[in-house]
C-alpha cells in the first residue's frame, strides 16, 4: 500500500516529514518530495507550492514517482459556515473550482470543460477521516470544498462566492486541481483541511497568519490516524 500526501506549504508538511522512517528527500522542479514509511506504510510527501498550477504539477509528479493507491491533501482552509471554529477540520465530500467560468459554452459555473462539475472524494477515505478521534477540542465536518487562485478575505469576494455556491463549507487554493488530476489518473483522493480563518470575519488574513501553523497540526493528526488505518488497505 502506497499513500501519497500533498501539502502546499512547508508548515503544513513538517510534522509529517518528522515522522518519516528512512526519509529520503529529492527536489523535483519547484517541489520538495520525501519518501519513507509512517507506521510501516510506504508514503510519499510532496510540498507542491501554493496555487492550482503548482498543485497540479506536484500531484502529477507524485503519481509518476510513487504510483500511490490513494492521495491525501492536507493543510488549512478558510471556513465559510458560522458553526466552524478556527482549528476545526473539514473533510471534502466533493471539491470544485470557484473561479472557472465556461458558462458561455453550456458548462456549469465552476466546471472546467470536459471535466465533471465537481470531483467526488473517495467515500472510503472520507469515512476513515470522519471517524478519527481527535486529541484536541477540534471538531470534524464533512462538506464541499472549493478552490481558486485567490486568498478569500474581502466582503465582496465572500458575497460573490456565496451567491454562486451557497453550499460551500471551506475554501482554499489547491484542492480542486489535486482532485482534477486524481480524477484524470483514476486515483482515489480526499482533502483534509483545518480551518485557519473564518472568511466572513474582518481581519481574516491576520487570523490566518496567527493560527495557520497550529491549525495545520489538527489536519496532520487526522492524516496520521488514516495512515494507520490504511495499513490494512482500502
UniProtKB/Swiss-Prot annotation:
Cystine residue pairs: none
Gene3D superfamilies, alphabetized: Nucleoside phosphorylase domain
GO biological process terms on file: L-methionine salvage from methylthioadenosine; L-methionine salvage from S-adenosylmethionine; nucleoside catabolic process
EC number in record: 3.2.2.9
Annotated GO CC locations: cytosol
One function term, GO molecular function aspect: methylthioadenosine nucleosidase activity
Catalytic reactions on record: S-adenosyl-L-homocysteine + H2O = S-(5-deoxy-D-ribos-5-yl)-L-homocysteine + adenine; S-methyl-5'-thioadenosine + H2O = 5-(methylsulfanyl)-D-ribose + adenine; 5'-deoxyadenosine + H2O = 5-deoxy-D-ribose + adenine
Binding site for substrate: 78, 152, 173-174
Catalytic residues of the enzyme: 12, 197
PANTHER family: 5'-METHYLTHIOADENOSINE/S-ADENOSYLHOMOCYSTEINE NUCLEOSIDASE, 5'-METHYLTHIOADENOSINE_S-ADENOSYLHOMOCYSTEINE NUCLEOSIDASE
Name recorded for this polypeptide: 5'-methylthioadenosine/S-adenosylhomocysteine nucleosidase
Organism: Desulfotalea psychrophila (strain LSv54 / DSM 12343)
Gene symbol of the encoding locus: mtnN
Amino acid at each position: 500500500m502506497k499513500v501519497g500526501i500533498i501539502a502546499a506549504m512547508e508548515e503544513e508538511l513538517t510534522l509529517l516529514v518528522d515522522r518519516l522512517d528512512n526519509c529520503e528527500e529529492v527536489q523535483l522542479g519547484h517541489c520538495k518530495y520525501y519518501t519513507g514509511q509512517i507506521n510501516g506504510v510506504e508514503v510519499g510527501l510532496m510540498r507542491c507550492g501554493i496555487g492550482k498550477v503548482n498543485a497540479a504539477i506536484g500531484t502529477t509528479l507524485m503519481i509518476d514517482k510513487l504510483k500511490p493507491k490513494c492521495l491525501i491533501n492536507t493543510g488549512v482552509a478558510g471556513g465559510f459556515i458560522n458553526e466552524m471554529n478556527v482549528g476545526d477540520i473539514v473533510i471534502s465530500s466533493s471539491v470544485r473550482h470557484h473561479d472557472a467560468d465556461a458558462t458561455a459554452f453550456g458548462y456549469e459555473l465552476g466546471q472546467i470543460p470536459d471535466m465533471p462539475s465537481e470531483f467526488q472524494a473517495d467515500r472510503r477515505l472520507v469515512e476513515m477521516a470522519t471517524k478519527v478521534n481527535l486529541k484536541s477540542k477540534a471538531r470534524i465536518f464533512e462538506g464541499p470544498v472549493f478552490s481558486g487562485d485567490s486568498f478569500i478575505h474581502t466582503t465582496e469576494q465572500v458575497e460573490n462566492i456565496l451567491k454562486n455556491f451557497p453550499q460551500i463549507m471551506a475554501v482554499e487554493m489547491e484542492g480542486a486541481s489535486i482532485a482534477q488530476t486524481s480524477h484524470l489518473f483514476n486515483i482515489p483522493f480526499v482533502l483534509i483541511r483545518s480551518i485557519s480563518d473564518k472568511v466572513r470575519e474582518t481581519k481574516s488574513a491576520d487570523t490566518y497568519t496567527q493560527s495557520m501553523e497550529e491549525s495545520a497540526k489538527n489536519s496532520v493528526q487526522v492524516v496520521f490516524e488514516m495512515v494507520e488505518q490504511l495499513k490494512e488497505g482500502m
